[in-house]
C-alpha cells in the first residue's frame, strides 16, 4: 500500500453558502460594508471583501450569502459572525442562527514523485488528458465526489471535496489506483 505520510495537502480556497435567516435591505448593507460594490443592473447582490479574515462575500437580499477565498472553516465562521455583528448594528433581526454549508474545498499538494502523464492517461480509468489544452491529468473520484489534477511533477490540485477528510480519501483512492496499475511503485524499505 502506498504511504500517504509524504503527501502534503494545503487548503487553497473554501466556498460556502450561508443562510442568515433574515431579509436584507442591500442599500443599508452597502453603508456598513466598506470595500464593497453593488450594481443591481449587473448583479443582484453586494460583492464585499473583508481583510480579516481575507474573504469575499456575495450578499443577497434574501439573507443568503456565498463566502469564498477562505483558507479555513474558522475563517468562514469569523466572516459570517463579523457580518452578523454589522447587520445587528443596522437593526437586522435573525430568525435563528446562521446555517453554513461547505460547497467546495480546493487543496494543493505534492505526491513527492514524478509521473509520465501519457502512461497515466492510457492506463488509469476515470481520467482525461489533453496536453495541448491542459498540462495535467484530470482524475475524477466518484465517492467522495472530487476531481484531482495530477501534474508530471507529482503536484496535485484536489477540488470538489466538501471536507478535508474527503480530499484525503480522494487522494488515497488516486494513489491506490496508480499503484494498482503499476504507475507508482511502493518505496522499498532500506535494510
From Swiss-Prot:
A Pfam family it matches = TBP
The UniProt entry, under InterPro entries, shows: TBP, TBP_archaea, TBP_CS, TBP_dom_sf
Molecular function (GO) terms for this protein are: DNA binding; DNA-binding transcription factor activity
The alphabetized UniProt keywords are: DNA-binding, Repeat, Transcription, Transcription regulation
* UniProt record, GO biological process: DNA-templated transcription initiation
> Would I find Ribonucleoprotein among this entry's keywords?
no
Q: Give the domain of life.
A: Archaea
Q: Where are the sequence repeats?
A: 11-87, 102-178
PROSITE patterns per the UniProt record, alphabetical = TFIID
Q: Mind telling me which HAMAP family this protein's record contains?
A: TATA_bind_prot_arch
Q: Which family does it belong to?
A: Belongs to the TBP family.
Q: PANTHER family, per this entry?
A: TATA-BOX BINDING PROTEIN
> What biological function has been recorded for the protein in this entry?
General factor that plays a role in the activation of archaeal genes transcribed by RNA polymerase. Binds specifically to the TATA box promoter element which lies close to the position of transcription initiation.
Question: What name does UniProt use for this protein?
Answer: TATA-box-binding protein
Give the species this sequence originates from: Pyrococcus abyssi (strain GE5 / Orsay)
Per UniProt, what is the name of the gene that codes for the protein in this document?
Answer: tbp
